[in-house]
């Protein structure tokens, strides 16, 4: 049995067992073929241990749909250091972007397992967002802003107000020079319809936005996708300069050229969410040579590694030989060198044989050379054939009972590193498992791979079995302090708040666990760099620039309302006459006016959907508040709505000589534009595409149109659907326009009652006002305006009440819009 120094607290349970096993095998003369690895430096840079992520998907089995757990990441461990670039590579579907999201804290904590540490300390998601930036694969930028204006906006929202505007401009010019964008300083970003910067420059602008505040960590998702080799090399070269300034840079990349490979410091190669290689790009050839698959002359080592991965992935043995070799340096046997190809087969769900114990759900593949203690374990290569046979013959669906499982452990413990699908640590001796299971059954709520969180405030003394190991204070068994209070947050990727009790277990000896410091945001630090008012001003400035430089956003609706005002005026003539035909013409004119205003707001659907992706990118790291965005967009568009409403009201009032008040007419149209725009933006925030957005807006607006009281009066709508009449946003401006036109007894209408039918007025009803003032009315006054309102089932004859209710709907739509942006527009995996 190997001797362990009790002062060494940075050793994992599995690593100590590896050392014990290595000592036994060395005594027996065993040896292990080593594969080239790059040793990790504990307590430095970004460390990630045992990251696993699974999702539930529905699959059809025997004609029945069942839920199946699919693992996108499977027990990945490694490290990224400051001043270096770590590239995440792998074939399509390997989990590169998922892995990057896991490190960046963009996966919901409940669905991700493992630990992420910075300089040896666990971190919270809020702290990770505070010190890092994430550059998405797609360049979501405003096309009508220049490069300088884009960077200046980022500086205004990312840098605190304590930094003067001159210093912010200086930082922008430094960034332009650092990214090689000096020549494109005043060039528009551009898009498909507008000429702007090149693809490589556009990508560098996207990177510059997220490094304006000099983050410690930079995550980039496919920064070279869609670029030619020269532009891609230029982008990575600038990223290399960023890393040299002291940042930790991690990026996914699909097929780097040889020149780009030479810029990378470390690469992490994944395959189906499993770690295949971690080390220097120059070490890939030695890795493959040790795997008995030397790189052919003239071949690129990384590309050849991807070919080998594909070959094994499609074979009967799967990826296990590659993963085992990366993990333990175990070479495959002769049969595994040339795998027999087979049709792709959907893997079955890994299941834990010992179902009663609360083992972690993800599959254990902890690499001994990733541990912070002993870097290499010793194994007997003679036993690999037995091991490989066990791997190939393992049945995913068989569950052994406890006795059979204990016996299998006793048989396999001396020589077999079990398959990854077994869910059991291969090097656990049977006697240790029995002791450990007792510990589990006496109050453990967590799992061996994800330790529970302690509630004690002081140092915690936890008794542990002394069967061949010293402590569990490693990254795999880290204990984090839970301090009461509102400022306390659970460290990222750590388990829940369950409590462990050891009341009935007598340990061999006791070990004191030191409570780790958790890196979190300072208690008094503001989440956002700027106050709310300043954010509104800066966002309003940018939105105004976009509207001015994109005149079609304003002119298109202005032209529509102008042209339609002229067309309507030519259709509806002599509306100043006081006959029965005029009543129907007025009703038709006003309902068409309101529908025109509502449907003209549909152009906001594609506009906001484009902005939504920019909003998600900018707010993913707390650039500004969602409320600031909502209010700023409203402030900028209010004067444009006023101009548009006055244009239509002025044209129609002047040509048709309407008897209504032009001020009230304009105010009703203005309120309708504000409310309809709020509704369209709410729908745009909920739908995935502008096509769906158009469909939803048109369908709901048509429903509002049907139930507003024009086609079916309130009393004619079935009782079960009458609530639609009151939530119809068209009802209130329509009624307000009619009240503005017909209220009171100052207008008298005469004619044949047959002129009212067919028409929206229907059966004529005489109002109480007419009955009370019959004697004062002229002899030829058959109907007064009040009778028209009474016949249309309009009872509350108050223009201001209708306007207030209409604006209240607009406020409610804006509030819902804010809620969607605040809580449901997060770029985070569940």
From Swiss-Prot:
Composition bias, Acidic residues: 395-405
Top-level taxon: Eukaryota
Pfam families on file: ABC2_membrane, ABC_tran
Cell compartment(s), UniProt: Cell membrane
Residue segments, region Disordered: 333-356, 368-422, 471-491
Gene Ontology BP terms: response to symbiotic fungus
Molecular function as annotated in GO: ABC-type transporter activity; ATP binding; ATP hydrolysis activity
Listed InterPro entries: AAA+_ATPase, ABC2_TM, ABC_transporter-like_ATP-bd, ABC_transporter-like_CS, ABCG_transporters, P-loop_NTPase
Keywords per UniProt: ATP-binding, Cell membrane, Glycoprotein, Hydrolase, Membrane, Nucleotide-binding, Translocase, Transmembrane, Transmembrane helix, Transport
Annotated protein name in UniProt: ABC transporter G family member STR
Native organism: Petunia hybrida
């Amino acid at each position: 049995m190997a001797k362990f120094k009790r002062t060494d607290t940075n050793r994992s349970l599995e690593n100590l067992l590896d050392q014990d096993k290595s000592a036994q095998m060395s005594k027996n003369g065993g040896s292990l073929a080593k594969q080239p690895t790059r040793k990790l430096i504990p307590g430095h840079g970004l460390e990630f241990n045992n990251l696993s992520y699974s999702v539930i998907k529905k699959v059809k089995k025997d004609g029945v749909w069942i839920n199946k757990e699919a693992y996108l990441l499977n027990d990945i461990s490694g490290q990224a250091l400051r001043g270096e670039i770590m590239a995440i590579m792998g074939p399509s579907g390997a989990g590169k972007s998922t892995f990057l999201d896991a490190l960046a804290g963009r996966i919901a904590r409940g669905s991700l397992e493992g630990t992420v540490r910075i300089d040896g300390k666990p971190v919270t998601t809020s702290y990770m967002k505070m010190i890092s930036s994430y550059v998405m694969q797609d360049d979501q930028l405003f096309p009508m802003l220049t490069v300088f204006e884009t960077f200046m906006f980022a500086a205004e929202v990312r840098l605190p107000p304590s930094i003067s505007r001159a210093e912010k401009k200086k930082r922008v010019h430094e960034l332009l020079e650092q990214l090689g964008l000096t020549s494109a300083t005043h060039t528009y970003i551009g898009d498909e319809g507008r000429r702007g910067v090149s693809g490589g420059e556009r990508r560098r602008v996207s990177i510059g936005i997220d490094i304006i505040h000099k983050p410690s960590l930079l995550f980039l998702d496919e920064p070279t996708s869609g670029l030619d080799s020269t532009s891609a090399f230029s982008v990575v070269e600038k990223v290399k300069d960023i890393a040299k300034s002291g940042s930790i840079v991690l990026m996914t990349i699909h097929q780097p050229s040889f020149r780009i490979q030479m810029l990378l410091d470390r690469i992490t190669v994944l395959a189906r969410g499993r770690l295949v290689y971690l080390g220097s790009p120059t070490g890939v050839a030695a890795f493959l040579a040790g795997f008995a698959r030397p790189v052919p002359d003239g071949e690129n080592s990384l590309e050849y590694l991807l070919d080998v991965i594909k070959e094994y992935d499609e074979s009967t043995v799967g990826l296990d030989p590659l993963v085992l070799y990366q993990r333990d340096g175990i070479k495959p046997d002769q049969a595994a060198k040339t795998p027999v190809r087979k049709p792709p087969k959907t893997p079955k769900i890994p299941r834990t044989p010992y179902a009663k114990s609360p083992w972690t759900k993800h599959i254990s593949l902890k690499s001994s050379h990733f541990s912070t203690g002993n870097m290499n374990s010793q194994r007997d290569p003679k036993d690999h054939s037995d091991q490989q046979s066990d791997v190939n013959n393992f049945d995913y669906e068989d569950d052994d009972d406890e006795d059979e499982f204990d016996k299998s452990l006793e048989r396999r413990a001396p020589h077999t590193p079990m398959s990854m699908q077994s869910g059991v640590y291969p090097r656990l001796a049977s006697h240790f498992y029995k002791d450990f299971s007792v510990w589990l059954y006496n109050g453990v709520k967590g799992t061996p791979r994800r330790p529970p969180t302690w509630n004690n405030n002081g140092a915690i003394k936890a008794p542990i079995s002394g069967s061949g190991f010293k402590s569990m204070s490693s990254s795999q068994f880290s204990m984090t302090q839970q301090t009461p209070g509102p400022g306390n947050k659970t460290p990222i990727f750590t388990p829940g708040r369950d409590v462990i009790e050891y009341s009935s277990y007598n340990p061999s000896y006791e070990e004191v666990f030191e409570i780790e410091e958790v890196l979190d945001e300072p208690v008094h630090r503001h989440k956002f760099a700027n106050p709310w008012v300043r954010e509104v001003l800066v966002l309003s400035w940018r939105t105004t620039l976009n509207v001015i430089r994109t005149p079609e956003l304003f002119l298109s609706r202005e032209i529509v309302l102008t042209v339609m005002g002229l067309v309507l005026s030519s259709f509806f003539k002599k509306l100043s006459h006081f006959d029965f035909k005029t009543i129907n013409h007025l009703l038709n004119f006003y309902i068409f006016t309101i529908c025109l205003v509502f449907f003209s707001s549909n152009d906001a659907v594609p506009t906001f959907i484009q902005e939504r992706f920019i909003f998600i990118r900018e707010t993913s790291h707390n650039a500004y508040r969602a409320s600031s965005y909502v209010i700023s967009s409203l402030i900028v568009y209010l004067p444009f709505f006023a101009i548009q409403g006055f244009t239509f009201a002025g044209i129609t009032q002047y040509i048709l000589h309407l008897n209504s008040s032009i001020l009230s007419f304009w105010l009703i149209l203005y309120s309708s534009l504000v409310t309809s725009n709020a509704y369209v933006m709410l729908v745009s925030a909920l739908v995935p595409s502008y096509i769906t957005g158009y469909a939803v807006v048109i369908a709901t607006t048509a429903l509002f149109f049907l139930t507003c009281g024009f086609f079916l009066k309130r009393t004619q709508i079935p009782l079960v659907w009458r609530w639609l009449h009151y939530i119809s946003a068209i009802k209130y401006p329509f009624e307000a326009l009619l009240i503005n036109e017909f209220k009171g007894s100052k207008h008298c209408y005469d004619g044949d009652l047959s002129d009212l039918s067919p028409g929206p007025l229907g059966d004529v009803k005489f109002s109480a006002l007419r009955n009370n003032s019959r004697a004062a009315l002229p002899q030829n006054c058959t109907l007064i305006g009040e009778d028209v309102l009474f016949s249309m089932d309009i009872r509350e004859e108050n223009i201001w009440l209708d306007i207030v209710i209409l604006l209240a709907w607009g406020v409610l739509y804006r509030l819902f819009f804010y809620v969607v942006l605040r809580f449901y527009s997060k770029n985070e995996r569940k």
